[in-house]
Amino acid sequence: MIMKVVVKVGSNLLVGSSGLRKSYIAELCREVARLKSQGHEISIITSGARAAGFTYLGKGKRTQDLHIKQALCAVGQVQLMKVYENAFDFYGIKIAQILLTRDTFSNRKRYLNLRNTLIGLSEFDVVPIVNENDTVATEEITLGDNDTLAAMFSIAWDADFLVLFTTVDGVIDENGKLVERFDESVKLKDMGKSSWGTGGIRSKIESALMASRCGVKATICSGNDVSNLTRFVKGEPVGTVFEPQGRLKAKKAWIAFLSEPAGKIYVNKGAEEALKSGNSLLPVGVTGVEGTFDVGDVVEIVNEEGELVGRGIVNYSSSDLEKIAGHKSSDLKKILGYEGNKVVVHIDNMWVA
């Protein structure tokens, strides 16, 4: 069976004291070529652009100044892609560069365009090499780290597997033992962060959980042995495994994990129970509105204690919803002056937590 596999490789594996570890990238590409020869589709989520730019320019020092970091990424991304291209050329494999920001996923139109692009690349049998577009990403639109990017990309691509490579064997519990199957009751040992990377083990766990909740089987495992990639796809126990929890439909997965909520709708206990039973949200169950949003925006639905109940695409603007909150659907025309939608958020456009 042909599988879609996403492998994420961080700076701590790709970058050494003298710059990009070209020999390591060659090993990784060899392993990807092996999987492709078996018919599988592979995408690589790569870090390393900033470090590659730093080494290539051969001057300066590490800095937190945003414009310097973005300039280093702009220079380094070219060097990074050259190394991948040269490594894959040996196997006759062509690659594509994809640079993304959070807005690519949260904006529904751009998200669908990304999915269509990936379909096209699949038809050309091209390996996507994916990174965050750090040269334009600001604090408002940054993904924060490539672990999050890997999870979001896995969901957008409808991947079967997500492999998060790290420098350790997997998730380590407070007793120093490897956690082979993850559950949220595990007490963790603090593993810290790498010198170049932005994500620690907790970031990887959150990303693996996000993917698994959308039906992607994930692992956090050692990237020092690139054969772990093939072994995991073959079904061997590798690292810390996050079992898939049922695949959400593409639209609901987007609503749940990729969209950016524009506001909140507060609901009463009766509405909360109705939503959890698979019903749509009606005006009578709404107790309050927070934020400014329009028809078609994604909103969070929260209960009276402020706990998340779900997310959904709303059929009313925040101003109109404030007017009809708590009222029966039969009262809408009198309140609004027009025949409003009887449903605030339809169950087909809703993810329930």
UniProtKB/Swiss-Prot annotation:
GO biological process per UniProt: L-proline biosynthetic process; proline biosynthetic process
MF terms (GO), sorted A to Z: ATP binding; glutamate 5-kinase activity; RNA binding
Alphabetically ordered keywords of this record: Amino-acid biosynthesis, ATP-binding, Cytoplasm, Kinase, Nucleotide-binding, Proline biosynthesis, Transferase
PROSITE patterns: GLUTAMATE_5_KINASE, PUA
KW Nucleotide-binding (keyword) present: yes
Catalysed reactions, as listed in the record: L-glutamate + ATP = L-glutamyl 5-phosphate + ADP
Residues reported in the UniProt entry to bind substrate: 47, 134, 146
Binding site for ATP: 8, 198-204
Xref: SMART domains: PUA (SM00359)
Subcellular location: Cytoplasm
Annotated family: Belongs to the glutamate 5-kinase family.
Protein name as catalogued: Glutamate 5-kinase
Pathway named in the protein's UniProt entry: Amino-acid biosynthesis; L-proline biosynthesis; L-glutamate 5-semialdehyde from L-glutamate: step 1/2
Transmembrane spans: none
A Pfam family assignment: AA_kinase
Domain (PUA) ranges: 262-339
